Regions:
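Conserved interdomain linker/interface between the two RecA-like ATPase lobes of SF2 helicase motors
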Residues: 248-311, 315, 327
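Conserved helicase motor
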Residues: 145-153, 157, 167-177, 184-191, ...
């Protein structure tokens, strides 16, 4: 294999390459616009001035230092061999087919697109034909998402549904190898340059992507000059809505789930003194009763808490109150998060307590959801819509329990409920 095989479509700083490799590479200025970093688009700051009067970019420093007095290096992407790559033999609903056809047509026309589809609509399958249409011709495609958990789940599904090699890229993944299909966290896009014929960004409204100019820049750099960007979301953002209005993005909407049933609408439940009870190692009686009643059904229970510290305390109290249950807790700081999530999916864990880390991109068949302190400022309307979307996703149980325990309703709660009802209305449910 050519020693530079895995360099094609990648962007490098000077000292990430040997002098021999630099001679074989093409170069691009490290400065774009008036005074911004080519790689991430951030302005060079006076405080990041070097002794020789050059500047460096602090925003993307972890990927190698970009300096104004040094070029950036890249190796142009090469075509892959043509391949009939789609193994998936499933069928789409009429609603899904409409979106799939629209995507294929827009990719053909190189029309940037926003797919606004409700949670549980089957977005992944709707992308397949557009993805395959390019890989079949020797093209390269990247599916990116802000969350590692989402990327890993997507990677597993794609391995079953496509015959080509696939690489998975995130902060803790194996080194990159060049493949026609790449699954990556959105930050990893900063390492590519004109590499992909199609970049699909899933869960585009999620932290840290939501309206983050660095990651929009990364997506623009990663796609080829004649390539196309597609954004997928269940809850749009102000920036994306602006792009739709200005004609930069064409919007394709799907307000209906794949199984044809309406979205589950959250029920608000008022309660008080959650923090006070927590300090006394107790559960608010109203919350305890609701959990007790839910456990009688035997369905798995996912409980969201707004903060890690509260989640840890809450998990301990839950174990004391429900000793017969197997209880897990996950947050962004949980090292074995993936194993715990898998344990919940396999029903080894019966109650899973989580921060917003599991608000999106994961499916647990038949799950019920309780949001504790839904009024907390960390719960945006977008995250509450996503959390609600965990319920009723499976054909076997398209309904479920969805409770927002709050200490006074908020604009985010009301907006989330209104949005869910509006989607049901658009789908023809009264």
């Amino acid at each position: 294999m050519n020693e530079l095989e895995n360099y094609h479509g990648r962007l490098f700083t000077k000292y990430q390459l040997t002098s021999e490799e630099r001679e074989k590479a093409k170069t691009v200025s490290s400065v774009v616009g008036k005074n911004s970093c080519f790689r991430c688009g951030t302005s060079f700051e006076e405080e990041n001035k070097l002794p020789n009067a050059a500047y460096y970019c602090r925003a993307c420093l972890l990927l190698g230092r970009v300096r104004t007095d040094e070029k950036l290096y890249y190796f142009p992407q090469k075509d892959f061999s043509m391949n009939a790559c789609l193994l998936w033999k499933g069928t789409l609903t009429d609603w899904q087919q409409r979106i799939s056809d629209g995507l294929v047509a827009n990719v053909e026309k190189r029309q940037a697109t926003l797919v606004h589809a409700v949670t549980g609509a089957g977005k992944t399958e709707m992308m397949y034909h557009a993805v395959a249409s390019l890989i079949n011709k020797g093209g390269a495609v990247c599916l990116a998402s802000p969350r590692i958990d989402v990327c890993i789940e997507l990677y597993k599904r794609l391995q079953n549904d496509f015959s080509v090699p696939i690489s998975l890229l995130h902060g803790k993944s194996d080194p990159y190898f060049r493949t026609p299909l790449v699954v990556a966290t959105t930050h990893q896009l900063l390492k590519f340059y004109q590499a992909f014929d199609l970049v699909l960004i899933d869960e585009v409204d999620a932290f840290p992507y939501a309206d983050n100019p660095i990651l929009y820049r990364a997506a623009d750099n990663a796609v080829k000059v004649d390539g196309v960007l597609v954004f997928l979301t269940a809850t749009s953002t102000d920036e994306l809505d602006k792009k739709v209005k200005s004609g930069k993005l064409q919007k394709l909407s799907l307000p209906r789930r794949f199984h044809g049933n309406p979205l589950v609408v959250p029920q608000k439940v008022w309660f008080s003194k959650f923090d006070t009870y927590l300090k006394k190692n107790k559960l608010v009686p109203k919350l305890r009763n609701a959990i007790q009643k839910q456990r009688e059904t035997g369905y798995p229970l996912l409980i969201f808490v707004p903060e890690i510290s509260k989640g840890l305390e809450f998990a301990t109290i839950m174990e004391q109150n429900f000793p017969e249950e197997t209880i897990g807790f996950v947050s962004s700081q949980t090292d074995n998060r993936l194993e715990i999530v898998e344990g919940f999916r396999n029903k080894e864990i019966t109650i899973l307590i989580s921060t917003t880390i599991l608000e999106r991109g994961v499916t647990f068949p038949g799950v019920d959801v309780i949001v504790v302190q839904a009024n907390h400022y960390l719960y945006t309307s977008s995250s509450l819509v996503q959390i609600s979307g965990r319920v009723g996703r499976s054909m076997d149980r398209p309904t479920g329990l969805l409770l927002f325990f709050h200490e006074g309703s908020t604009r985010s709660i009301e907006k989330a409920i209104a949005e869910i009802k509006q989607m049901n209305k658009e789908a023809g449910y009264v």
